[in-house]
Amino acid sequence: MTTVLFVCTENSNRSQMAEAFARMHGDGLLEPHSAGSRPSGTVNPRAVKAMAEVGYDLSTHHSKSVSEVPTGPYEFVITMGCGDACPFVPAVERDDWDLADPRDLAPPEFNQVRDEIESRVKALLERVNAG
């Protein structure tokens, strides 16, 4: 199983949704985790609502730091716009998905970020499948 860690600043929006999509679409190919460089402690209610709209329940998830997930090394570490604030985590391959933080966006714009994350997770799965 391919291990992947999604990292953003608060682990309350982008990385949570990426982990959720990896679980939804991964068909057991991925072991996904998510964390934040400065976790907020909670998942944004907007993210919970946005993911509920596509059939995933984030309501029981919580925001966590890198120290709360397995130490790796991971096959993939995907950072999401946290720049220099992203902690170093050992990985075979690293990528930065420069995605805007949707935290304060209106639902239509928030959902655009959600949909972009889903698209990128699906592309990552295609890479893993092509392996």
Residue map of PLM features:
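Structural motif
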Residues: 68-69, 86
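Functionally engaged cysteine thiol sites
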Residues: 8, 13, 81-87
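Phosphate-binding/catalytic loops
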Residues: 76, 82-131
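Alpha-helix C-terminal capping/helix-to-coil transition sites in glycosyltransferase folds
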Residues: 71-73
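Conserved active-site segments centered on acidic
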Residues: 1-67
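Short alpha-helix boundary/capping motifs
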Residues: 50, 79-80
